[in-house]
Amino acid sequence: MMESGAGFVAMEERISPGSFFQYPLSGFRASPNRSPCPPSDRERYLTELLQERQKLGPFLQVMPNCCRLLNHEIRRVSSFPDLDRYEHGSPFRSLGQPTNGKLDLEGWSMMQAEENCHLQRASPFRGPSPVGWIGMPGLPNPPIVKKVIRLDVPVDKYPSYNFVGRILGPRGNSLKRVELATHCRVFIRGRGSVKDTVKEEKLKGKPGYEHLCEPLHVLIEAELPEDIINSRLEHAVHFLESLLKPMDESMDHYKREQLKELAALNGTLREESPSPSLSPCLSPSMSPFNSKRAKTEI
């Protein structure tokens, strides 16, 4: 039985993600050393790299060079936008992003800074050190455990706010970054989690979609060593809770960066105007935060 709020719940089986909210990454740049390939192939390649990076998590200390090279390859084939202009108000600061530098893959994970001296970076949040986790003779390895946290989305208080778009970001990129930075998996469940409302009505009651009868909520899942899993879940909860608190658009720097990224992906980003107003080149229909779910290309 799942508990609401921020309580930990052990799960015997991994929760399989629903295809209705899994948006693929897009916008990859071609490597000068690789022949051009269709976007679907590049997206598939990056997905495989991210999966391999997650599997290598427990072996950072014994295979640091492999992890470092894999991180460089992920960064090379991806085209995540420059986030160095996030101001104080961006939730990514809570994930250890430097205040005056780019958010790159070698600095995304706070835990990676503890596990791999090659990737060490300063972070305001430090979980328990995994020294003794693996590769240290004479010390027992902590067991791998699975925990899930449920966060209810306050749609009753803010019925017109597009929380799903805020969490996913342009083409799902924001959610991917959160998962990579926290080593947790994030699932959007409940009423309103399906982009197509007509399709959602058809899916209600079918096996695997029982959650559509529940209020909109977010599940944060982690399967990690017992001595570090709570700290990583806390990082994910802290970040996602900040996204579930609507704020004035003039102060919402996170939304502003997402809008810029969306414009860049659509090829409509122009030079910034000296006016402090929010990117005039972006039409309201392009915003992932409109009351109606922004259309997302697959």
Swiss-Prot record:
- Keyword set, alphabetical order: Nucleus, Phosphoprotein, RNA-binding
UniProt subcellular location: Nucleus
Q: Which Pfam families match?
A: KH-I_KHDC4-BBP (PF22675), STAR_dimer (PF16544)
All copies of domain KH, residue ranges: 152-219
Report biased composition (Low complexity) as residue ranges. Answer: 274-288
Q: Which SUPFAM superfamilies match?
A: Eukaryotic type KH-domain (KH-domain type I) (SSF54791)
Q: Where is this region: Disordered?
A: 266-298
Q: Enumerate the GO terms in the molecular function aspect.
A: RNA binding
Q: Which residues carry this modification: Phosphoserine?
A: 273, 287
Classification via InterPro entries: BBP-like, KH_1_KHDC4/BBP-like, KH_dom, KH_dom_type_1_sf, STAR_dimer
Q: Which GO terms describe its cellular component?
A: nucleus
PANTHER family from the UniProt entry: OS01G0886300 PROTEIN, RNA-BINDING PROTEIN RELATED
Protein name in UniProt? KH domain-containing protein At1g09660/At1g09670
